[in-house]
UniProtKB/Swiss-Prot annotation:
CDD domains: KOW_RPL26
One Pfam family hit: ribosomal_L24
Keyword Chloroplast: no
Annotated function: One of two assembly initiator proteins, it binds directly to the 5'-end of the 23S rRNA, where it nucleates assembly of the 50S subunit.
GO biological process: translation
InterPro entries: KOW, Rib_uL2_dom2, Ribosomal_uL24, Ribosomal_uL24_CS, Ribosomal_uL24_KOW, Translation_prot_SH3-like_sf
GO cellular component: ribonucleoprotein complex; ribosome
NCBIfam families referenced in this protein's UniProt entry, alphabetically: rplX_bact
UniProt keywords, alphabetically: Ribonucleoprotein, Ribosomal protein, RNA-binding, rRNA-binding
Subunit: Part of the 50S ribosomal subunit.
This protein's name: Large ribosomal subunit protein uL24
Length: 105
């Protein structure tokens, strides 16, 4: 089970976008994440009429390493560490370390 999953709200804790919040759009292999509105780069795109792509300069979210983000805990309005716990029914769930609140209830 991963500490950060697709759809989680995260906050960037290191790098040029430190302090920005966003949703995880995808989790890539090698501990990389694509986060909405974070690590944006400008790419020059060639027009391709066969695919219906117009040319120009587009902004694209590039991957960021998972060690540079923390799961955002709305209860304390900060990034928080994630722990794992086994429930009585045998399910493995994530929880916030500071508040002991379950994430995957």
């Amino acid at each position: 089970m991963r500490r950060i999953k697709k759809g989680d709200q995260v906050i960037v804790i290191a790098g040029k976008d430190k302090g920005k919040k966003g949703l995880v759009l995808s989790v890539l292999s090698g501990d990389k994440l694509v986060v909405e509105g974070v690590n944006l780069v400008r790419k020059h795109q060639r027009p391709n009429p066969m695919r219906g792509v117009t040319g120009g300069i587009v902004e694209k979210a590039m991957p960021i390493h998972s060690s540079n983000v923390a799961l955002f805990n709305a209860a304390i309005n900060k990034g928080d560490r994630v722990g794992f716990r086994l429930l009585a029914d045998g399910r493995k769930v994530r929880f916030y370390r500071s508040t002991n609140e379950l994430i995957d209830a």
